[in-house]
Amino acid sequence: MLSAARAELGKRGGREGIDCSTFVRAAFSAAGVDLYSEASPRDKGVQAIRRYVRHHGRLHRRRHPAPGDLVFFDNSYDRNRNGVLDDRLTHLGIVEEVRADGTALVLHSTNHGVVREPMNLRRPHASTGAGGEPINAVLRRRTPHDAPGTPHFMSELFAGFGTVFGAEHPAQPVARRHLRGGARRR
């Protein structure tokens, strides 16, 4: 699944290319998993994928995800255009690797194409680490209308992780478990 996701790096994203949920769905489809199989007719792509994980995997908020875990984000854009940070499940990606400092490298599709970007939940408001290396990418574009303190980094917009494949048997979905009440907010 990760090799299929990596093969998409650099390909067009956004309106003219592959969006985030289509990118993630295609990567998992390469491993024989249809992430839309539990979708409700009203679900958007990210919602459909989260529903699949809720039914066939595990939703969690650990600080140390595993490679292959999904990462969900809220408020990556103002979907309902009301100027309020109330837009749940607006983006997702795939954790490619996790570094010793806790920085997860996330593969996801943006308006600039499929990219690899960092997210560090240990330091959610920092853009760089002690050595100047990037640890949190901007996910929500800054606008002149943003109030002070509006979240922009991936880590600030983090809504939870989803595990589809179990560590012991990477090709097998994990047992069904539910996170009570969905991914909790910090």
Language-model segments: residues:
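N-terminal capping segments
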Residues: 1-42, 50-54, 149-186
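Aromatic- and glycine-rich peptidoglycan recognition patches
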Residues: 81-186
